[in-house]
Amino acid sequence: MENYIDTVAAMGRTVIVTGTGNNGSQPWHAGGILQQGKTEEIQLAVGAFEPTLNVQLWKDYEDEMEIYLESPSGERIGPLYERLGPQRHLLENTELLIYYGKPGPYQLSQEIYIDFIPEGNYVDSGVWKVLLSGKRVRSGQYFLWLPGGNVLNRGTGFYSPRAVGTLTIPSTAGKVISVGAYDSRQNAYADFSGRGSQFLPIRKPDLAAPGVSISAPVPGGGYATVTGTSFAAPFVSGSAALLMEWGIVKGNDPFLYGEKVKAYLRKGAQRVGGYEEYPNAVSYTHLTLPTNSLV
């Protein structure tokens, strides 16, 4: 999807704006740096009455890692080896289906997909463990994902989740303007707002805009107080429209679109409080229309 959006963004006089998602404070993402000869343990809590579950493990394809899986009772399988087709293992009353993916024409990473299928009605609850042992490591970075969108029961999630790297698609596309949310009253980044990572090939998010307790119109008339990056993105799309009107419609700059609009918005942005390094995992800074940059 990112490649398609980047292609569309390069056609005509367009600017594409998207929110970074609201997974920053959720326990659905974990990750780290695995060193050669070392072992990392990732603990996953599975709540009661979880009918199904899957974990996506992403790593650099050139890194060789031994993977072990341990059930709440201490039963363990591994090391797992890469091979074509699904691997089936039974731990307690849960069957594990494991698929090793391959790199593709547009990515260097490898996905290892782990599906938890209960023999009865529910996945065994308790603390599951994923153990990674570095065998032949170059970069060592790895990320684990659980399904988002509130499809999991309360109590299911990683014990040590990471906020960095919680951008949602399509905010990971390079030529879009990816917008995080901040609390304009406190001048503080919103904890739920999706964050970027130093391991991404490009720095994201691009900007932060007000996304906490925003007064917005609702269907049927009236207003309501809303929160989320979906309500931060319109501030930036409106600002982009004003810049394009000034440049294209009013004849001041017929080329004011695409990455040029993004560059102007970045330059005019101000820093969000609480951070010493800019740009960082939360954004370049928060939105301010760059009127001084246009003259």
Question: What residues fall within each predicted segment?
Answer:
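Short, intrinsically disordered, charge-balanced linker/junction segments flanking boundaries
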Residues: 278-284
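Subtilisin-like serine protease catalytic core
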Residues: 11-13, 51, 62-65, 173-175, ...
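Substrate-binding/access-modulating region of protease and related hydrolase catalytic domains
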Residues: 1-33, 49-79, 83-173, 219-233
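Hydrolase catalytic cores
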Residues: 55, 64-66, 72-73, 211-277
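Conserved small/polar residues in nucleotide/adenosyl-binding loops
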Residues: 285-291
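Non-catalytic, beta-strand-enriched accessory regions in extracellular/secretory proteins
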Residues: 35-47
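Conserved, compact domain cores that house catalytic/ligand-binding motifs in diverse enzymes
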Residues: 158-221, 225
